[in-house]
Amino acid sequence: MEELQGYLEKDRSRQQHFLYPLLFQEYIYALAHDYGLNGSIFYESAEVFGYDNKSSLALVKRLITRIYQQKSLIYLVNNSKQNRFVGHTHNNFFYSQMISESFSIIVEIPFSLRLVSYLKEKEIPKYHNLRSIHSIFPFLEDKLSHLNYVSAILIPHPIHMEILVQILQCWIQDVPFLHLLRFFLHEYHNWNSFLITQKKSIFVFSKEKKRLFRFIYNFYVFECEFLFVFIRNQSSYLRLTSFGTFLERTHFYGKIEHLQIEKLIVICRNDFHRTFWFFKDPFMHYVRYQGKAILASKGTHLLMTKWKYHFVNFWQYYFNFWSQPYRIQINQLSNYSFYFLGYLSSLLINSSAVRNQMLENSFIIDTLTKKFDTIVPVILLIGSLSKAKFCTISGHPISKPIWANLSDSDILDRFGRICRNLFHYHSGSSKKQGLYRIKYILRLSCARTLARKHKSTVRTFLRRLGSGLLEEFFTEEEEVLSLMFPKTTSYTLHGSHRERIWFLDIIRINDLVNRS
């Protein structure tokens, strides 16, 4: 344990001191705007409160000006004791949102500077940082077919917010920062309920404080993986062959290869929605996305059990809470399917007989080949559609009443876009039949929504306008695939359903996929 403590303290030698006077400068709004204000900061809140995204810049300036006046800040703090700062009025709620976002932006500055300096130091070209989310699957196809065991890991979640504050306290010596952070967390007394639930394995961030909670959660996950790197270094005398980080930003993925371990703090940047991290050596491979990770090895079950033991004990020692050993499941790859990144993945074993002729003797050799297979988890997708009110839990399509007040073209466009995005993301599935069931649900849900709007039945509505109206909006993805794979090839979209396609433009996971 002393060795671990020294390992951690060595990396934390560069603790951060934040310049809080920046928070109270009148023109900090310009910095906030350059940091991606038009991207994701106020995307949800602007919809909730009816503000136009174009006016966010003026709102930030107005708020910072009010913060600059200490009376307004004192009023907000005092008023929060009565209204819980969650906002019984739209104004208080929106002001608290703005303060939280500005606070998060300031906190991100030191870590973004470290990332930029590292890229310049290593002279990493920008075009090398672009990488699709689908690029992880060829890596799994290439590596997992040679391995024996896989551990499905759910990153344990902290049971108390003070644990998160203590984690940050190890890195940050700025007392005002910690006090302000505690203030935000205590005011959101029910933050645990919307940050994570017992039934989900990933953190579900609050729409109101998404940026702030992403920052805190990324810090926490970094600490979990920091222990993992320490254990890995202690258990092997060989250096890692290669390792890297996939950082999903607002608009693209960045891949940083040959990243020094002490530089992995860059994953704590708040505007990274989700983070991949993996390393590979001849015998072990690790991949994580959000709060779910897989650890695959060519070793024995005993070796994987030792890894599980180390994980549980180090997490309990470091985070001071029960880390729930059942969150690490060890299974043999040959007879196990695991859900990862919206796909149900497994290792298929195919047997083929080869006749070998040697002089006058002939014999048959049975050859076993392993293949990494990915399919669409139809039941989980139907569950996601059910939560989004497109169908019942059994998959029966229903109307979407909340969209009934939109124009016909907007309704068709929304349903068509969801369907095309799902087809696009699950193009790597070896079995496409499940996708056509999802398409049927969305098409009929669209028809029911239009019929509800026009106060008619689905049959009457389709008879009047024709079923081709819906077909036009749901076939774009299939037309693209037809252009990519001409009829002269063996690929047919409605034929074998076995071809897998990994696209290089998948920059984020679909929300419906993420729910499942």
From Swiss-Prot:
Localization annotation: Plastid, Chloroplast
Superkingdom of origin organism: Eukaryota
GO process terms (BP): mRNA processing; RNA splicing; tRNA processing
InterPro entries (UniProt xref): Domain_X (IPR024937), Maturase_MatK (IPR002866), Maturase_MatK_N (IPR024942)
Sorted UniProt keywords: Chloroplast, mRNA processing, Plastid, RNA-binding, tRNA processing
Stored Pfam families: Intron_maturas2 (PF01348), MatK_N (PF01824)
Main localization, broad class: plastid
One cellular-component annotation, GO: chloroplast
GO MF terms held by the record: RNA binding
The protein's role, per its UniProt record: Usually encoded in the trnK tRNA gene intron. Probably assists in splicing its own and other chloroplast group II introns.
Family, as annotated: Belongs to the intron maturase 2 family. MatK subfamily.
Protein name: Maturase K
